Amino acid sequence: MRSAVVVALLVMVAMSLQLTAAQEDLKYFEREVVAELAAQILRVAQGPSAFVAGPHKRNSELINSLLGIPKVMNDAGRR
């Protein structure tokens, strides 16, 4: 289903580009917007792995790491 939506969006973008290319007055800003939309469509088509920066941490791991910061700083001050 998602791939069908992506293909439909790509077809619409291609058709709109053909219409605007006929006019030959795409401004720099419009080209930038089209490029950004195409990049977003590709990121969505690649799936959730495109949005992940690194390994997932559980909420408890995040909380423990945040709560452990003062202890680490306190231990560093004793040295």
Curated annotation (Swiss-Prot):
Any one Gene Ontology molecular-function term assigned to this protein's record: hormone activity
Signal peptide positions (record): 1-22
A Gene Ontology biological process term: response to light stimulus
Compartments reported by the entry: Secreted
Coiled-coil regions listed in the entry: none
Tissue: Eyestalk.
GO CC entries: extracellular region; synapse
Keywords: Amidation, Cleavage on pair of basic residues, Hormone, Neurotransmitter, Secreted, Signal
Modified sites of kind Alanine amide: 76
Xref: Pfam families: Pigment_DH
Homology family: Belongs to the arthropod PDH family.
Role summary: The pigment-dispersing hormone causes the migration of the distal retinal pigment into the proximal end of the pigment chromatophore cells and thus decreases the amount of light entering the retinulas. May also function as a neurotransmitter and/or neuromodulator.
Further remarks about this protein from its record: The function of PDH precursor-related peptide is unknown. The sequence is not well-conserved among different species and that might be an indication that it is inactive.
Protein name (record): Pigment-dispersing hormone type 1
